[in-house]
């Protein structure tokens, strides 16, 4: 469905918009799902958005070849093998922006498989744990690394993830309650001293 592919492109642009990427990168991200599914031809893209955007889309597509390697989605693999795959990925592309678009595409995919069967979620999470989260870390893109790791942990360790999420929620409620009490006490003290001021938590 072209509309779903376009929606994925919009989501990728939204992910990248926080990184202050240039307009060609955002255009390539928006159009990549449509181009990858051959919904829009390369000739049409070249005429409408130019060669630079098409080259970026090519670079992202080339990175898909890495998925054929067992090291991308298995547990029984050494850190050296995984590191080799990451180096291969970086060597495959001439433009750093291709890697950033690919990271956004993987995040969009992780979001999409939230309600998919468990084996599909686990497969996507293993691939990102082995390859893409460390790649984001190596490139210094902490924002994307954090979201990749968050989804991976949620899918690979769901019970532990729910436990931690519950603890964080309880701590937030405790903190809000403490602030509310403190602000109330401060307002009362200021009123008693005749001080007119607004206090917010």
Where are these regions (language model features)?
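Active-site helical microenvironments for divalent-metal-assisted chemistry
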Residues: 1-201
């Amino acid at each position: 469905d072209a509309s779903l592919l376009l929606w994925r492109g919009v989501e990728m642009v939204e992910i990248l918009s926080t990184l202050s990427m240039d307009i060609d990168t955002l255009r390539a991200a928006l159009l990549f799902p449509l181009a990858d599914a051959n919904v829009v031809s390369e000739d049409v893209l070249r005429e409408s958005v130019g060669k630079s955007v098409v080259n970026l889309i090519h670079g992202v597509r080339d990175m898909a070849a890495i998925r054929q390697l067992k090291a991308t989605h298995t547990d029984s693999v050494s850190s050296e093998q995984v590191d080799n795959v990451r180096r291969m990925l970086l060597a495959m592309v001439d433009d750093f922006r291709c890697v950033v678009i690919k990271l956004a595409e993987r995040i969009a995919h992780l979001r999409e498989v939230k309600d998919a069967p468990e084996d599909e979620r686990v497969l996507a999470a293993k691939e990102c744990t082995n390859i893409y989260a460390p790649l984001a870390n190596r490139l210094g893109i902490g924002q994307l690394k954090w979201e990749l790791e968050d989804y991976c942990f949620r899918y690979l360790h769901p019970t532990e993830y729910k436990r931690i999420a519950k603890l964080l929620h309880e701590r937030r409620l405790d903190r809000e309650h403490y602030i509310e009490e403190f602000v109330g006490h401060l307002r009362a003290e200021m009123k008693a001293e005749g001080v007119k001021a607004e206090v917010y938590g």
